[in-house]
């Protein structure tokens, strides 16, 4: 892997991790079209660190408040809307953990094909469009009860199917439940913190036990590039989502999915 490849892959990861357009659909393009080799475990860990740092730093005030409220509810029995939201994020994380443990091998063996990614990119794009057009868009994230959190968590678990998009699935579920676009996006981004942490930790453990060589320059490129691109992406998405809605992302997903099918049929 060259520094240019490291930069491009980290940029793709940072830009697509938090937009409802599927990072997996984009990350297969360099290897499928340009023949780039797999970037390896170490680089995967690096871009997870970068994107995690971006969302934690962007929502640093909320993260500190939610952690404090969560611990206060555990050790002092205090109840607050912040503690409730923190517990809803915990509940929403559980389905993905279970699904990942049970279905990891099935996904890796049977569902990582370009045809699956193209199909899910289109189908979940259309679902996002339908929900965005018909949702009530009234509630904020603090109104989520455990049933809503579990529903969104199941959507996050299904997003492990390549091409679905974690942010796309969770935002779609939140919109369906009546969240405003901004609240759906914020809840999705806050939900990403524990799941990216767990995924990155799992990859880090695999890296340590694999003995794979580590190239510090590539890792720094991955961390810095994914951090900057993800941070800017979160900021711009939250600023623009209320007035532009989800239609631009739906159109992009349809073009991407059709383009992938066209490439596969001509290859």
From Swiss-Prot:
Keywords of this entry: Antibiotic resistance, Cell inner membrane, Cell membrane, Cell shape, Cell wall biogenesis/degradation, Hydrolase, Membrane, Peptidoglycan synthesis, Transmembrane, Transmembrane helix
Cystine residue pairs: none
Pfam families, per the entry: BacA (PF02673)
Gene Ontology cellular-component annotations: plasma membrane
Cellular location(s): Cell inner membrane
TM stretches of this protein: 1-21, 39-59, 83-103, 111-131, 144-164, 189-209, 218-238, 246-266
Top-tier EC class: hydrolase
Membrane topology term: Multi-pass membrane protein
Function: Catalyzes the dephosphorylation of undecaprenyl diphosphate (UPP). Confers resistance to bacitracin.
Note: Bacitracin is thought to be involved in the inhibition of peptidoglycan synthesis by sequestering undecaprenyl diphosphate, thereby reducing the pool of lipid carrier available.
Family named by the database record: Belongs to the UppP family.
PANTHER family reported in the protein's UniProt record: UNDECAPRENYL-DIPHOSPHATASE (PTHR30622:SF4)
Full protein name: Undecaprenyl-diphosphatase
